[in-house]
């Protein structure tokens, strides 16, 4: 998993409340669990005028010119500014996969759905909860200033505005540790690989019949 320490990026404002995971990545694209190839279908039903199907190249689709991510000023955005209850709906992990593969590193919103919130951390995305009034201010600034960028400093737990003002945010220490070091669940487990192997060897030595049971 990619580490997250400090990131400065262009902000794209998604001015909708209750954006659910089916809007983030529609159900017809959930047939794969390879964790790759979901970026082109992020927000598919809003991003394109035609209905998307697996295997149809992005070049053959009809972009919706009114959708925020299709507007030239937001091309290359890596910080998503969202409204409350972002990521509600089903628990599909494909949603953070699609956001990550599109190029987003952080999402700022007044609130997130719990399962989506946790899935973000497990996939290298940083979800940041800020007061609704602060998010409103950021929306106004993003709309008023083309090329609007924010800096997210995870180590110091601040979002830095272009003029230098710092906005603090909270993050669970364990989640922060994992992002700073690029550890997903598998990475955390592999840090203890030697202990796991030693435990398995000792267990089989004391209970050799288990090896026959496992082989059977």
From Swiss-Prot:
| Cellular compartments per GO CC | 3-isopropylmalate dehydratase complex
An example GO BP is: L-leucine biosynthetic process
According to its UniProt record, the EC number is 4.2.1.33
Q: Which residues cross the membrane?
A: none
The record's annotation in InterPro entries points to: 3-IsopropMal_deHydase_ssu, Aconitase/3IPM_dehydase_swvl, AconitaseA/IPMdHydase_ssu_swvl, IPMI_Swivel, LeuD
Statement: the UniProt record of this protein carries the keyword Lyase: yes
Q: Name the pathway it acts in.
A: Amino-acid biosynthesis; L-leucine biosynthesis; L-leucine from 3-methyl-2-oxobutanoate: step 2/4
Q: What does the record give as the reaction this protein catalyses?
A: (2R,3S)-3-isopropylmalate = (2S)-2-isopropylmalate
A GO molecular-function descriptor:
3-isopropylmalate dehydratase activity
Which top EC class is given?
lyase
SUPFAM superfamilies for the chain: LeuD/IlvD-like (SSF52016)
Q: Does the keyword Glycoprotein apply?
A: no
Keywords carried by this UniProt record: Amino-acid biosynthesis, Branched-chain amino acid biosynthesis, Leucine biosynthesis, Lyase
Domain of life from the UniProt record: Bacteria
* UniProt record similarity statement: Belongs to the LeuD family. LeuD type 1 subfamily.
Self-association and partners: Heterodimer of LeuC and LeuD.
Instruction: State what this protein does.
Output: Catalyzes the isomerization between 2-isopropylmalate and 3-isopropylmalate, via the formation of 2-isopropylmaleate.
What is the name attached to this protein's record? Answer: 3-isopropylmalate dehydratase small subunit
